[in-house]
Amino acid sequence: MNWDETRRALRDWTGGQPRAEHLAAQILAAEGFNDIDPVHPFGGRDGGADAFATLEGKPWIMAAYFTREPRELSAIEKKFKGDLDGVDKNGASGIAFVTNQVISRGERETLKVHASGKARIFHLERVATVLDRPEMKSIREKYLGITDPADDIRQVLADHLEKQSSGGESSEPEGEATNTDVSVVEALIVDPLEQIGKVQEAERAH
């Protein structure tokens, strides 16, 4: 996994609105929001919110804004102000605005002024940072298709050991290390991007 893979997957979003809303809900859950209740991620009247939630016991609304290409601040601001109407409409204490857009600190402050400070803005960098936490690994895989090379390595090694235990891979005496065993161990200590290939190459050569 490259260091900016999560960021790039978010920036070049192709998942559509339903997936964006579900991913946004996961971000809120990771950031201390509770009672998250999506409204109509697959279409329909949403009552001015993509989801309802609570933060510190107070009602909040969520709005997800994911696009395939970057938007100018004017477009982001227009969307934010439109979603902001849902705060008063639903008697909420604030809005959690989750987006894949790059929004600078100064721009975020400008948006918060419209909300009288009652906003949490989860912009591209913040969302990527949350998703890159170790505990968010399954969420990255589910919504962004990002897998951990280590998982693939473990699977290849598990398959290799299973073949050995069934007697289908080695004709050498029990207790002696085979050439494949040595190659597997060596593969586990090199760069992660090379590990899978080395293990598979060792098995083919055996």
Can you name each region flagged by the protein language model?
Residues 1-206:
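Mixed-charge (Asp/Glu-Lys/Arg
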